């Protein structure tokens, strides 16, 4: 039993402003019909007594211990920079007016 017609696919394509060829309309009609068939099968599953959930994983704010690690000094970080001003990287301005 077909759940979606070629004309319905054409209508959806127009709403989405998609230019589909005749072959694409036929192909997508079949694909969407298969998807809707699977959705119907899922909807038919008896879920009586199953608690609704939006996320089965209840891990919230999982933290790790802070650990220090070696890093570059400010001088080492700026050593290869094309330009630096007041101990910071200097980059060309890309937004707004210069001050």
Curated annotation (Swiss-Prot):
Gene Ontology biological process terms from the UniProt entry: glutaminyl-tRNAGln biosynthesis via transamidation; regulation of translational fidelity; translation
GO molecular function: asparaginyl-tRNA synthase (glutamine-hydrolyzing) activity; ATP binding; glutaminyl-tRNA synthase (glutamine-hydrolyzing) activity
SUPFAM superfamilies for this protein: Glu-tRNAGln amidotransferase C subunit
Reactions it catalyzes: L-glutamyl-tRNA(Gln) + L-glutamine + ATP + H2O = L-glutaminyl-tRNA(Gln) + L-glutamate + ADP + phosphate + H(+); L-aspartyl-tRNA(Asn) + L-glutamine + ATP + H2O = L-asparaginyl-tRNA(Asn) + L-glutamate + ADP + phosphate + 2 H(+)
Gene3D superfamilies: Glu-tRNAGln amidotransferase C subunit, N-terminal domain
UniProt-listed Enzyme Commission number(s): 6.3.5.-
The entry's keywords: ATP-binding, Ligase, Nucleotide-binding, Protein biosynthesis
Subunit relationships: Heterotrimer of A, B and C subunits.
Task of the protein: Allows the formation of correctly charged Asn-tRNA(Asn) or Gln-tRNA(Gln) through the transamidation of misacylated Asp-tRNA(Asn) or Glu-tRNA(Gln) in organisms which lack either or both of asparaginyl-tRNA or glutaminyl-tRNA synthetases. The reaction takes place in the presence of glutamine and ATP through an activated phospho-Asp-tRNA(Asn) or phospho-Glu-tRNA(Gln).
Family: Belongs to the GatC family.
HAMAP family noted in UniProt: GatC (MF_00122)
Protein name per its UniProtKB record: Aspartyl/glutamyl-tRNA(Asn/Gln) amidotransferase subunit C
Native species: Mycobacterium marinum (strain ATCC BAA-535 / M)
